[in-house]
């Protein structure tokens, strides 16, 4: 019953005597005479897996994959990805990256012809393809069979200028109709707006545009789809991770993974002070909630079980020893430790990192080194893009393997990045992380949330959703907060680092609230560089931190972007992976912020006093 604890205790006594998909698309359900693209692709993948050898699967290109599809499958992939109705005859104009070459595969097959000119948007060359359609239902196809590239958008031009165009029954339900003009946000799932548009032929200016979902660009990906994980699950627990889904003072959530043969789990836990006694107290037990996670495209590890426990009724400010397992003698993890949040205002420290995403082995060296350098941190914030392929489990396996020994001792506090949102929905992320469910009504629980630790409150937001959908909740949460220190955590930055990137919707809906309720810092990611702004209020530099908010962008992985000089940048650097430690000191109400590189060298620092 207390096997793991007893084994370790006995060993310690002798020594003393001797000296861790499927994505589900949300929104309006598919309606039509054919199966959805999602169901069709699932059927294709299942057939490929059962009838084609691993060697052929890994060598398959787009041409080969297309040749293996049935006429019905080709028709669905060419016409059922995006559908809508128009009330007047229109010219549909597909705007896509020139680098896509012969993609989408259906473009020429269906009679679209090039318009004969190209322009550059956000540093990417795009071209235009057109075809006339009559009144009624119009269906457009998938972005590609290979994945990658940005999703196309579709402009609509009435064939008769004097007619008024109405677009109805738009599917998927998340898509929206916009206008081809300066400031257009071409994708509903990305906040970046187009910069000032170059001169367009007059006939294109102001056209209605179907704003698409960029993360659906991989919906029909059939190439390089099958993987092997480098870290397959075993019977023994691994990927042990701490999070919070309740009050950090009195609860602790624990998640872990096992192979398919282990179908149940539990946690044994005891106060560290009781464990260290000459006659240790018996550990308590809490049963886990277990679910099967299946990934057909993971060839060597398609099924695992994931287990979640939330321990309640803990004492504030108390260290605990725990182990996870299935109850068998040899089915326990090594002992680990967590500490609950203090029940009163006390000084504390926490770590913050931007995108890990790429080069997870190198990132692992950073997070391990950071924890060795600052083992006193209470928890670790990650501002999105923890992995590159958020709905492919082998990427998460690498993430958890690289962070082993850290996130089983210190809770991780994640925000959702665009890469967790792979395929248009962060399904695997939501399955893996047990987080507070106190976010805005009308959006999925755990995508936005808030929690308090000592005299600080943290507001975690999702920039893949609309800013408007979280603004009312955010204001209520900020207004109700009595914390001395306030931090926002989200992925896409309000003040960008990367050239030609901008996220005006964040500044429209969120930063006025940060100004009104005096947010101290916004902890961001996405731009793969390091940037710290001057204190900002009303979108202007102000004299000191007592008047404005400091916005940080950082990256902890190995993917880097260039950085533009910006009038709001107080300090910036590129090609540097960093971790940040924030020390909140009660004496003098002081925040000491420091940024370190992979060698532990101090690269930036700031002190805020209240």
Which residues make up each language-model segment?
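Structural beta-strand segments of beta-rich domains
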Residues: 80-82, 90-92, 250-254
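Noncatalytic modules at the cell exterior or secretory-pathway interfaces
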Residues: 130-144
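Acidic, histidine-bearing metal-coordination/catalytic regions of metal-dependent phosphoesterases
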Residues: 164-351, 577, 583, 587-610
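Extended active-site neighborhood of metal-dependent phosphoesterases/phosphodiesterases
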Residues: 308-310, 319-337, 395-482, 509, ...
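Active-site environment of divalent metal-dependent phosphoester hydrolases
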Residues: 322, 358-364, 388-392, 418-425, ...
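Active-site neighborhood of phospho(di)ester-bond hydrolases with catalytic His/Asp-centered motifs
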Residues: 352-354, 379-385, 411-418, 461-462, ...
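Core catalytic region of metal-dependent phosphoesterases/phosphodiesterases
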Residues: 364-422, 516
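Active-site-proximal segments of metal-dependent phosphoesterases and phosphodiesterases across multiple
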Residues: 484-524, 541-544
